[in-house]
Amino acid sequence: MKTNFLLLAAACGVAALAHQPAAATGRMTCNAGPQSGWRTQAQLIERLTRQGWQVRRTKIDGGCYEVYGTTPQGDRVEAYFHPVTFRQLLVSRRGQVIFRAPGH
């Protein structure tokens, strides 16, 4: 009986976690206003590619553009950019911050 209760409790816990909405990581917030005023992710990818980046993936996180890719120096990173100005705000490699813009 106790085993059945534990299994039911575990199943309910897993189901509750699975139905939680995706949340921002909290590493960076941009407060960039409505998305209608943002530049596109495609424009950011084009700009980074011209600078020598290899972009694997982009997404919106915390009101910023989050980019997974390789820098021109060959570092595989996660980077955050302001969606209006494309200012680089944070770059981290394997959880270690290697660049953070002043004030962020």
Residue ranges and their predicted role:
Residues 95-104:
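Short, low-complexity, Pro/Ser/Thr/Gly-rich segments in the mature regions of secreted, periplasmic
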Residues 67-70, 81:
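Conserved histidines in hydrophobic membrane contexts and catalytic metal-binding motifs
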